[in-house]
């Protein structure tokens, strides 16, 4: 029986030393699922609310005992006796019980942890892997693929204490024939980059997502360093390895002046000027994907950016869409970007996450599954990427066990599925590429 008999919440620690919510869901047949909510550093203003205690005397106000109390109290009471396999029903019960637009009463961190734990318990009860259960919930049973990783090997912005304003410089092993081979290629470039940075006198300390966080003279210098690292590792840029960036431009947008300020290199841009700045980088390097290239509220600027670059490369909305189908629907209607970043905790439940992925795919958008800067050992996003055949995943660099946990889970899944889960490389990325 997959009937829920116990729901338990607790406060645990994330990869940045901040508390987060972990939940357990126990079923009548002895099955148990456990999951933890991640937490972001650069967050969209329209994300579902992450409930924090606000008690400055405890964890600097970042405790999550209120959210844990919600799990152990009203959420547990509402879910006990329900069928864990009926994910949509469970999620709707929690959403209705919370009763707010952005899950402000219980916190998206509480609802999400329980939502994912219930899915894991249901998979155990069905005696299937989590990715298989997710495929069932997605209405695509038995349809899988291994995701092309976006590996964040230079961290800037809110993810690092350095002079680099653009938040993530990533590599994608598009020339690999399997995920395992792609992971190896990424690791080799990562270690090659360490040598390049050291030789130039830069620090090889890492940021929140495991990438290096050097002080560089410009954002373009990050791309130049990666170019050298790729060549030194024995790979060809544009053939074996392509590049991607997450600008997280809301973090350097000045709302008072309406300007984009790259303080690290002393430059200021209007929205159109910044779009042309990005176009220049795309013309210089094989960049196939740019995320959050403008402020989350700059829809006119995004329209211009999409007209300028949307036929050439993948333009990903993260802070722009916050995994929210209502906002995504507007983007699709207005022709804004061509891809969405998928983060569980931006919306706060598995069911709503699956709905966002489906809406994106139905509209011809790509969907990139993503971690957050504050992570745990929980590797659910690996199963989500495979179980929805999303095609791409962002889960950091090749260091820090909170990042590597997801890669290791993907290795296990590929081993189990073999040819049933193809690795499609650059075919998964939106754009027309002529390198």
Swiss-Prot record:
It holds the Pfam family Enolase_N. Its EC number is 4.2.1.11. Mg(2+) binds at residues 246, 291, 318. One of its GO terms (biological process) is glycolytic process. It is found in: Cytoplasm; Secreted; Cell surface. Keywords: Cytoplasm, Glycolysis, Lyase, Magnesium, Metal-binding, Secreted. GO terms for cellular component: cell surface; extracellular region; phosphopyruvate hydratase complex. Its main location: cytoplasm. It catalyses: (2R)-2-phosphoglycerate = phosphoenolpyruvate + H2O. Its cofactor is Mg(2+). The active site is at residues 209, 343. Pathway: Carbohydrate degradation; glycolysis; pyruvate from D-glyceraldehyde 3-phosphate: step 4/5. Binds a second Mg(2+) ion via substrate during catalysis. GO terms for molecular function: magnesium ion binding; phosphopyruvate hydratase activity. Gene3D superfamilies: Enolase-like C-terminal domain, Enolase-like, N-terminal domain. (2R)-2-phosphoglycerate binds at residues 167, 343, 372-373, 394. It comes from the Bacteria. HAMAP family: Enolase (MF_00318). Catalyzes the reversible conversion of 2-phosphoglycerate (2-PG) into phosphoenolpyruvate (PEP). It is essential for the degradation of carbohydrates via glycolysis. Belongs to the enolase family. PANTHER family: ENOLASE. Component of the RNA degradosome, a multiprotein complex involved in RNA processing and mRNA degradation. This is Enolase. It comes from Psychromonas ingrahamii (strain DSM 17664 / CCUG 51855 / 37). The lineage of its organism: Bacteria, Pseudomonadati, Pseudomonadota, Gammaproteobacteria, Alteromonadales.
């Amino acid at each position: 029986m997959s009937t829920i008999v116990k729901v338990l919440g607790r406060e645990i620690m994330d990869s940045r030393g901040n508390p987060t919510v972990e939940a357990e869901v126990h079923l009548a047949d002895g099955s148990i699922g456990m999951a933890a909510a991640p937490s972001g550093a650069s967050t969209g203003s329209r994300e579902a609310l992450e409930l924090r205690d606000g008690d400055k005397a405890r964890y600097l106000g970042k405790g999550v005992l209120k959210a844990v109390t919600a799990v152990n109290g009203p959420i547990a009471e509402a879910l006990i006796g329900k069928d864990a396999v009926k994910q949509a029903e469970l999620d709707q019960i929690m959403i209705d019980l919370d009763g707010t637009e952005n899950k402000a009463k219980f916190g998206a961190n509480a609802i999400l942890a329980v939502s994912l734990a219930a899915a894991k318990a249901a998979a155990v009860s069905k005696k299937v892997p989590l990715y298989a259960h997710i495929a069932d919930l997605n209405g695509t049973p038995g349809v899988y693929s291994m995701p092309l990783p976006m590996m964040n090997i230079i961290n800037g912005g809110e993810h690092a204490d350095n002079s680099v304003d653009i938040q993530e410089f990533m590599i994608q092993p598009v020339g690999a024939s399997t995920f395992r081979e792609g992971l190896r290629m990424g690791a080799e470039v990562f270690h090659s980059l360490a040598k390049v940075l050291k030789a130039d006198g830069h620090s090889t300390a890492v940021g929140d997502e495991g990438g290096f966080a050097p002080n560089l003279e410009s954002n373009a210098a990050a791309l130049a360093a990666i170019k050298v690292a790729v060549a030194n590792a024995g790979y060809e840029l544009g053939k074996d390895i392509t590049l991607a960036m997450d600008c997280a431009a809301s973090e350097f947008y000045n709302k008072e002046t309406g300007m984009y300020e790259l303080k690290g290199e002393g430059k200021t841009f209007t929205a159109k000027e910044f779009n042309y700045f990005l176009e220049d980088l795309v013309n210089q390097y094989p960049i196939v994907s740019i995320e959050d290239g403008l402020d989350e509220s700059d829809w006119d600027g995004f329209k211009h950016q999409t007209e300028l670059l949307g036929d050439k490369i993948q333009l990903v909305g993260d802070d722009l869409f916050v995994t929210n189908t209502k906002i995504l629907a507007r983007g699709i209607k207005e022709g804004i970007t061509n891809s969405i970043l998928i983060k569980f905790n931006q919306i706060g439940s598995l069911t709503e996450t699956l709905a966002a992925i489906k809406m994106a795919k139905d509209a011809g958008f790509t969907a990139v599954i993503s971690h957050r800067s504050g992570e745990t050992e929980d590797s659910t996003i690996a199963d989500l990427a495979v179980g929805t055949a999303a095609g791409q995943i962002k889960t950091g660099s090749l260091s820090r066990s909170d990042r590597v946990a997801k890669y290791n889970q993907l290795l296990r899944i590929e081993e189990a599925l073999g040819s049933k889960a193809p690795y499609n490389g650059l075919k998964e990325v939106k754009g027309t590429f002529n390198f």
